[in-house]
């Protein structure tokens, strides 16, 4: 019984990474850009219907909802070879098309105005599923639509579908560069509050680290958006392989999430992928064994989140799930796990078992690959809190001077005061404190002392 997943793509960033994700899924399942199954794609071992459904004329349509407050990106998708893939009824563009002006408050209050139209689409998709498992939301936390409308949708999805899982792929801004969005720290913090309170699982895609990986590992001087988005779509498709090529374990979303998230608030995951290649660099083929792949996944340079070095806190893994694709002998996996434990290659929490799990998955039979084995690590690691700390520091700088707040004051939510900003700051601080507490043996009783 397939547990379907509906993908919601929001704003410029969400629609761009979503577009790459669907391109990747079509290639892996042998589906043409028009949604027709290719003649060679006859092996019936994959499960397409988690992410696609079939129209009356047999062609496959993504269970995707494309939302944006300005038309540019969605128009470029509709002018691409993949225009006929999507269900046109599932595309929502706001009528005035002015966007959210990189302003969280504008995105949020536009969400309030248009939520009926949006939920008509989402409810229709949900009703068309046999047993909907949940939603996947793609967005960035820095702009206006992805952050503001994204926050609004996260709150409403919890109200309307309290039993459904909500997983997000959230793109964090590049902190090495000056941002062209001056209110980015406000947008990020307001969105982080919703990601903490309203999502079950957040896969953090950190632009700082993605740019670093593209430069250092793939040797691209100035990585373009599309190259970074290709990295992201690799992670997104790899993290869903066990759903699409089901094995015995981890063949639904809750199985993936349950093994990684033992305590509900600490649900921000980082990812690592190896071996990384872009099209040109396939020449650099190394031997890939399971141990190689698993050891490389633990190296910080392959992890797609840039975490600051925090000497005071002894950061550690809460849980790891490695999704290994390719020709793998299961006994090798067991040996590799033993080696990792014996050599203490990973530092785990002091208050629970060293949870490192491995899910084996088939590779797509239709895509040539230069590597026998590739791996994706999804890890719950306490050092992700340093990403939130730097968001808070940037926010505090602006908030202290009350900089750029007049753009927010125009919207109802901030008309009288800025309590919502301060509340968000508190929620994120509590999240940081809990991640720090999770590095100590007494975390089990954490939260009971304070009440």
Curated annotation (Swiss-Prot):
Asked if Transmembrane is a keyword of the record, the answer is: no
Mind telling me which GO cellular component terms the entry cites? centrosome; cytoplasm; cytoplasmic microtubule; gamma-tubulin ring complex; nucleus; pericentriolar material; spindle; spindle microtubule
Q: Which residues carry this modification: Phosphoserine?
A: 131
Instruction: Give any GO molecular function from the UniProt entry.
Output: GTP binding
Chief localization = cytoplasm
Name the UniProt key words of this record, in alphabetical order. Answer: Cytoplasm, Cytoskeleton, GTP-binding, Microtubule, Nucleotide-binding, Phosphoprotein
**Post-translation: what modifications?**
Phosphorylation at Ser-131 by BRSK1 regulates centrosome duplication, possibly by mediating relocation of gamma-tubulin and its associated proteins from the cytoplasm to the centrosome.
Q: Which residues bind GTP?
A: 142-148
Set out the biological process GO terms recorded for this chain's protein: cytoplasmic microtubule organization; meiotic spindle organization; microtubule nucleation; mitotic cell cycle; mitotic sister chromatid segregation; mitotic spindle organization
Q: Which InterPro entries match?
A: Gamma_tubulin, Tub_FtsZ_C, Tubulin, Tubulin/FtsZ-like_C, Tubulin/FtsZ_2-layer-sand-dom, Tubulin/FtsZ_GTPase_sf, Tubulin_C, Tubulin_CS
Instruction: Output the Pfam families linked to this UniProt entry.
Output: Tubulin, Tubulin_C
The places in or outside the cell where this protein is found are: Cytoplasm, Cytoskeleton, Microtubule organizing center, Centrosome
SUPFAM superfamilies (alphabetical): Tubulin C-terminal domain-like, Tubulin nucleotide-binding domain-like
**Is S-adenosyl-L-methionine a UniProt keyword of this protein?**
no
Q: What does this protein do?
A: Tubulin is the major constituent of microtubules, protein filaments consisting of alpha- and beta-tubulin heterodimers. Gamma-tubulin is a key component of the gamma-tubulin ring complex (gTuRC) which mediates microtubule nucleation. The gTuRC regulates the minus-end nucleation of alpha-beta tubulin heterodimers that grow into microtubule protafilaments, a critical step in centrosome duplication and spindle formation.
What do we know about how this protein assembles, alone or with others? Answer: Component of the gamma-tubulin ring complex (gTuRC) consisting of TUBGCP2, TUBGCP3, TUBGCP4, TUBGCP5 and TUBGCP6 and gamma-tubulin TUBG1 or TUBG2. TUBGCP2, TUBGCP3, TUBGCP4, TUBGCP5 and TUBGCP6 assemble in a 5:5:2:1:1 stoichiometry; each is associated with a gamma-tubulin, thereby arranging 14 gamma-tubulins in a helical manner. Gamma-tubulin at the first position is blocked by TUBGCP3 at the last position, allowing 13 protafilaments to grow into a microtubule. Interacts with alpha-beta tubulin heterodimers; the interaction allows microtubules to nucleate from the gTuRC.
Protein family membership = Belongs to the tubulin family.
What's the protein here called? Tubulin gamma-2 chain
Q: Which organism is it from?
A: Bos taurus (Bovine)
């Amino acid at each position: 019984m397939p547990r379907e997943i509906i993908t919601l793509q929001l704003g410029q960033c969400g629609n761009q990474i979503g577009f790459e994700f669907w391109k990747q899924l079509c290639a892996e399942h042998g589906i043409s850009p028009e949604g027709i199954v290719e003649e060679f794609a006859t092996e019936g071992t994959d499960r397409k219907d988690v992410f696609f459904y079939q129209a009356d004329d047999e062609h496959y349509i993504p269970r995707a909802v494309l939302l944006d407050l300005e038309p540019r990106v969605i128009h470029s998708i509709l002018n691409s070879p993949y225009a006929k893939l999507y269900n046109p009824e599932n595309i929502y563009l706001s009528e005035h098309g002015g966007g959210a002006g990189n302003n969280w408050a504008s995105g949020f209050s536009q969400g309030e105005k248009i939520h009926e139209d949006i939920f008509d689409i989402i409810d229709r998709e949900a009703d068309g599923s046999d047993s909907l498992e949940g939603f996947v939301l793609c967005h960035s936390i820095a702009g206006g639509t992805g952050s503001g409308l994204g926050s609004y949708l996260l709150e409403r999805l919890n109200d309307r579908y309290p039993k459904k899982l909500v997983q997000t792929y959230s793109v964090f801004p590049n902190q090495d560069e000056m941002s062209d969005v001056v209110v980015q720290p406000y947008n990020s913090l307001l969105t982080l509050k919703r990601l903490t309170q309203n999502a079950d699982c957040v896969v953090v895609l950190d632009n700082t680290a993605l740019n670093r990986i593209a430069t250092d590992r793939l040797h691209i001087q100035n990585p373009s958006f599309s190259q970074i988005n290709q990295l992201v779509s690799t992670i997104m498709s790899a993290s869903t392989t066990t759903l699409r090529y089901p094995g015995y374990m981890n063949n639904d979303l809750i199985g993936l999430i349950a093994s990684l998230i033992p305590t509900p608030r600490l649900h921000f995951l980082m990812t690592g992928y190896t071996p990384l290649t872009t099209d040109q660099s396939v020449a650099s083929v190394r031997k890939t064994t399971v141990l190689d792949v698993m050891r490389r996944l633990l190296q910080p340079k392959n992890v797609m989140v840039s975490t600051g070095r925090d000497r005071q806190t002894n950061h550690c893994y809460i849980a790891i799930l490695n999704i290994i694709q390719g020709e793998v002998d299961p006994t090798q996996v067991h040996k590799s796990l033993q080696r990792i434990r014996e050599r203490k290659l990973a530092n785990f929490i002091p208050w629970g078992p060293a949870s490192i799990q491995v899910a084996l998955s088939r590779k797509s039979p239709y895509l040539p690959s230069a590597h026998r084995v590739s791996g994706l690590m999804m890890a719950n690691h306490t050092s992700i809190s340093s990403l939130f700390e730097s968001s808070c520091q940037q926010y505090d700088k602006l908030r202290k001077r009350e900089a750029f707040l007049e753009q927010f004051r125009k919207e109802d939510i901030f008309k009288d005061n800025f309590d919502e900003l301060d509340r968000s700051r508190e929620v994120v601080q509590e999240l940081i404190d809990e991640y720090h507490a999770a590095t100590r043996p007494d975390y089990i009783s954490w939260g009971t002392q304070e009440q």
